[in-house]
Amino acid sequence: MKLTCVLVVLLLLLPYGDLITNNYIRGAARKVTPWRRNLKTRDVCDSLVGGHCIHNGCWCDQDAPHGNCCDTDGCTAAWWCPGTKWD
């Protein structure tokens, strides 16, 4: 019974993994993008802002940690664009 409850809770939280793992940008709260929007855009890097495509997301350069990602939300502390590290 306990295992079933744990599995149900995990399945309910699965779509909100981005809210749990990437909720800050360099110490400041960030605007959370909806999970379904991340599914549609996670493979796209915007070269106009200097994103580098690796696997299914973008990686941010350490020299310009704000505004050079695949989106305008900036980088996380680990230099990943929000919503792409664990996709």
Curated annotation (Swiss-Prot):
InterPro entries: Conotoxin. Residues 20-42 form a propeptide. Expressed by the venom duct. The cysteine framework is XII (C-C-C-C-CC-C-C). GO terms for molecular function: ion channel inhibitor activity; toxin activity. Belongs to the conotoxin O1 superfamily. This is Mu-conotoxin cal12b. One of its GO terms (cellular component) is extracellular region. It is found in: Secreted. It comes from the Eukaryota. The modification 4-hydroxyproline is found at P65, P82. The modification 6'-bromotryptophan is found at W59, W79, W80, W86. Keywords: Bromination, Disulfide bond, Hydroxylation, Ion channel impairing toxin, Neurotoxin, Secreted, Signal, Toxin. Mu-conotoxins block voltage-gated sodium channels. This toxin reversibly blocks voltage-gated sodium channel in cephalopods (tested on squid giant-fiber-lobe neurons) with an inhibitor constant (Ki) of 15 nmol/l, with no alteration in the voltage dependence of sodium conductance or on the kinetics of inactivation. Has no effect on sodium channels of the two gastropod S.luhuanus and A.californica (which are not natural prey). Pfam families: Conotoxin. Disulfide bonds join C45-C58, C53-C70, C60-C75, C69-C81. Residues 1-19 form the signal peptide.
